[in-house]
Amino acid sequence: MKKAYETAMINHGGRNGEVEAPNGSMHMKITPPGIHAEGTNPEQLFAAGYASCFNGAVQHMIKTAESTVKARVSLYNLDDGGYQIGVVLEVHIDGISEEEAQKIAEDAHEFCPYSKATRGNIDVEVTIV
């Protein structure tokens, strides 16, 4: 396997802190989920990354049509006191049938690096909207 790209982010303070790119291109305040404070949280950042990556995979499959992907990331309480995330990817592709869109979404799910990374680790549902 040949590395195509690498990036890094640095966090200070965990879920009540900040995250920044070492090159200074990004800096954000981090807050726990459900807190109505200025900032974002790890679940929102994961949703942003997954939606962008998955839509990139969809675009790779369709080439010409417009598409949108909404990633809904949920945080679940586990019986052991821990947490688990789950994802629903809502895919819309302009100008094609639901059956065609479903096939493209399935192919994108096999191609997307986020889907590959999460496969077998968390529940991911792909739906056509």
Where are these regions (language model features)?
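Extended beta-strand/beta-hairpin segments
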Residues: 1-48, 55-129
